[in-house]
Amino acid sequence: MSILEKVQPIETMLPERYYTMSTEDMEKRVREIKEKMGETLFIPGHHYQKDEVVQFSDAAGDSLQLAQVAASNKEAKYIVFCGVHFMAETADMLTTDEQVVILPDMRAGCSMADMADIEQTERAWKELTKLFGDTMIPLTYVNSTAAIKAFCGRNGGATVTSSNAKQMVSWAFTQKERLVFLPDQHLGRNTAYDLGIPLDKMAVWDPHTDSLEYDGDIEEIQVILWKGHCSVHQNFTVKNIENVRKNHPDMNIIVHPECCYEVVAASDYAGSTKYIIDMIELAPSGSKWAIGTEMNLVNRIIQQHPDKEIVSLNPFMCPCLTMNRIDLPHLLWALETIERGEEINVISVDKQVTEEAVLALNRMLERV
């Protein structure tokens, strides 16, 4: 079941008046509430959020940075998370019971996270155990549900982000002979390959057919990749790179490792959202860059670096649609309900799930 199926209508019904308010009036009200609430309110915002939302973030970052920020914040009573559902779940699990995590729009899910549900994962683990016994350890990208994080926690595994994937995959191989990486096959493949594992020692698990996709002796398999992907980064292609090389031969190409292996291999650089931001920041004035990641972030980088020539690797790219569900009207609505003493769209993860998921999260956080 996806998060969209779990949404209660009352939680996502933005009152009509927010559609008719001017941007200026909404921004004014957000500032007033932030000033009034002070440190009792904390607004983390992911880099992929719209500018209209990011401008009010108390901390902006990628998944790892926001997880660390959530874990360290003990002052705020209300954490209004401007990101997607799995990020708000992570914040809820890493904060105290007294802190309340709110997602301004409960429809802000993640298609990648929905590509691995707990029933599929338990079934896959059972079948893979028949083949490989006790030789596997699971790692899950943080872009996954709390239930999947809990699965990894109780099976000795951990979470990873694109910033620390190499560290965590290296650690995993000190624990077991084989790695099961979910839900993003591309990050898993690119990371394992960077660490020297040949492509022919990687298999793919298809959760829809409950089958292992691999040609060869299965005893040779070191990495089992879940057949999932990011719908945004899937849209960057080798053809995009060929077009840039042809029309702008002096342009650097930098992409996110959620792109497929062929795109990453053909690029000049690949790394996390933070890595991309830092690379552009440190690049010399006049340098040229084609960036393969989410469009809101690319546009923000372009605005912040007018001294550099920067374009999207895919000129027809669109933003992450679920991230974009968090907008200024929904942010203001969430804040005004808090101001009235109400709590809507509260993210509350089951206690048992939290305990097991935190095991996986802490195995990551203590190593980065």
Swiss-Prot record:
It is an enzyme of class 2 (transferase). Binds 1 [4Fe-4S] cluster per subunit. Iminosuccinate binds at H46, S63, Y141, V142, N143, S162, H256, P257, E258, T273. GO terms for biological process: 'de novo' NAD biosynthetic process from L-aspartate. GO terms for cellular component: cytosol. Its cofactor is [4Fe-4S] cluster. This is Quinolinate synthase.
